[in-house]
Every structure is written in structure tokens, then in C-alpha cells.
């Protein structure tokens, strides 16, 4: 009996390793999607229950809350990403989410055009370094760039317990939704240029997904009324923003249900084609 149980455990482990196809890399948006286990649920409901996100010590080390693109180009940190791929050769798709903290921590409304462009160039250069290191591991790897949706600093900075979002908003010199969203769109467009230069890199945009999914029914704006890429003069609805301690609303991160919507979008626009062309014959 012990031999049979050992065989089943080993067989199960091997099967899991072979089916772990996606590595999630990046900041808090990556980490929360990883921790919420959204991808596996989305893959399952769309007909790919055997394809999973890698979950082990290697993957835990590369989806880290608060990190920046600048953090990950440090050789010791970049090695964590490449090591995760080398140690887990079943992975052939990397979902990369970085650049948001580089933007939020360094941009403010008083910056000149030259300063904004310099910051943008630095972030793009760091992202380029990261994607080049990933692609150098294996020519069959693809990268899907997955960034962000509109924040909500309008309804998350007024109460005493909302000091984190308030301090961040103050550091940016209190931009309006139009100011921060238009600048975020501009930065993202610069990031996306990386995908336009390499057939192994893909991009799915998320701007407006929460506005589209939730709307503001009490204001007469129903779910589905606002088409993608949304209205950059508005925030994401408060309902979509992540809740901490049962009552504190986040200004930037999404509820698990919001990430589910986001990952379904990734599936519709990228993963389904990746899986259909590469894996479908293996699971039929």
C-alpha cells in the first residue's frame, strides 16, 4: 500500500510539473493574481483544466508586492526569473506585470516633459532588459505583457485609515483622474512598444475593464455601457477596488472578482490562441 501511495504522489507531482505552463512575474498585480489563483480557475472554466500556473518556491520568488522594473534588473533578482524558467522547463509562457510602481513612485504633476520622457525611457529600458533575459532562456518562450486598469484615488483618500493611498496621491501632487489616467496611458503605450518589436512578446490592454464590467448603476451607467478602453476622465468603480481588513478600499488594486475579469480578458485575447495552437491536441 505504501508503494502504491508513493507512486500516486510521484505521478501526481510529475503530472503537475508537466502541466505548469505559465509563470507569473512582477509586482503586486502579479502577486495578487497569483495568490488569488485566478488563472487556474479561468483556464478550467474555458476548457483547459490541465494547464496551470507554476506554483512552487521558484514562482513564489518572482511575484512580489511593491517591486519595480528597476528592482528586477538587479542581477541577483533577474537571476530569480531565469532560474525559475531553467528549473521548470515545462513553463513556456511568462506573464509580466511591471512598471506601475516605477510610475507611481516617481511621477508627479510638476514634472517637465523632459523629466517625464526620461522616466519613461528608464522604465522601458528596464523592461527591455527583463524580457531579453527571459527570452534568452528558451526560444520557445512567449511573454504576455499585462499591465493595469484605472486607479481610484477619488474615493479612497478621505478617511483617516486611508493614509496609504492619500500619501501616494499627495506625493504625485494630487492629480485628477484625467491627469493620472492620461499619463498612465502614455507610459503604457511606451511599454507596449516592446511587444511591437518582437514576435515573441504580446500585449493585452486592460484599461476600462472595471468601468465596463461594473459601471455606476446608481448614476444610470449600467455594466457594459462604457466600452473598452473606458473613459480616462473617470476612475475605476469603487466596487472593483480591493478591500482590506473588511472595510478599507484600495486605490489601485482589484478585488479577486476584478482580476477574474482581467484574466478572462487575457484568455480571450491571448491564452486561448496560445493553448489552441500548442496544447489542444495533447489534451483531446
Label for each model-derived stretch:
Residues 104-122, 157-179, 242-244:
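A solvent-exposed, charged loop/short amphipathic helix patch at secondary-structure junctions
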Residues 19-23, 29-122:
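Conserved SGNH/GDSL esterase-like catalytic core that processes O-acyl groups on lipids
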Residues 137-142:
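A short helix->loop->beta-strand "cap" motif at the edges of active sites that frequently abuts
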Residues 19-21, 29-32, 177-178, 182, ...:
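Residue-level recognition of alpha-helix boundary/capping or hinge positions
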Residues 3-13:
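Sec-dependent N-terminal signal peptides
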Residues 228-276:
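Histidine-centered active-site loop/cap adjacent to the catalytic His
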Residues 25-26, 146:
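Short hydrophobic segments within beta-strands
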Residues 153-207:
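Substrate-gating cap/lid alpha-helix
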Amino acid at each position: 500500500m505504501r508503494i502504491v501511495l508513493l507512486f500516486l504522489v510521484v505521478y501526481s507531482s510529475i503530472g503537475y510539473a508537466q502541466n505548469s505552463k505559465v509563470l507569473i512575474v512582477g509586482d503586486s498585480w502579479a502577486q495578487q493574481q497569483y495568490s488569488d489563483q485566478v488563472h487556474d480557475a479561468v483556464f478550467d472554466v474555458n476548457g483547459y483544466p490541465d494547464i496551470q500556473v507554476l506554483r512552487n518556491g521558484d514562482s513564489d520568488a518572482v511575484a512580489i508586492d511593491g517591486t519595480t522594473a528597476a528592482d528586477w534588473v538587479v542581477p541577483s533578482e533577474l537571476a530569480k526569473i531565469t532560474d525559475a524558467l531553467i528549473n521548470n522547463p515545462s513553463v513556456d509562457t511568462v506573464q509580466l506585470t511591471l512598471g506601475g510602481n516605477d510610475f507611481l513612485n516617481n511621477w508627479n504633476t510638476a514634472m517637465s516633459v523632459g523629466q517625464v520622457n526620461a522616466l519613461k525611457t528608464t522604465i522601458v529600458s528596464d523592461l527591455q532588459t527583463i524580457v531579453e533575459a527571459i527570452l534568452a532562456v528558451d526560444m520557445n518562450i512567449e511573454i504576455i505583457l499585462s499591465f493595469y486598469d484605472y486607479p481610484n484615488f477619488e474615493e479612497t483618500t478621505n478617511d483617516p485609515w486611508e493614509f496609504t493611498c492619500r500619501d501616494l496621491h499627495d506625493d504625485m501632487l494630487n492629480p485628477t483622474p484625467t491627469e493620472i489616467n492620461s499619463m498612465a496611458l502614455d507610459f503604457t503605450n511606451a511599454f507596449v512598444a516592446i511587444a511591437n518589436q518582437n514576435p515573441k512578446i504580446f500585449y493585452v490592454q486592460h484599461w476600462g475593464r472595471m468601468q465596463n464590467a461594473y459601471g455606476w448603476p446608481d448614476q444610470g451607467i449600467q455594466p457594459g455601457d462604457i466600452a473598452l478602453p473606458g473613459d480616462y476622465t473617470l476612475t475605476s468603480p469603487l466596487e472593483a477596488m480591493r478591500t482590506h481588513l473588511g472595510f478599507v478600499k484600495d486605490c489601485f488594486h482589484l478585488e479577486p472578482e476584478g482580476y477574474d475579469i482581467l484574466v478572462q480578458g487575457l484568455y480571450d485575447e491571448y491564452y486561448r490562441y496560445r493553448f489552441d495552437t500548442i496544447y489542444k491536441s495533447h489534451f483531446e
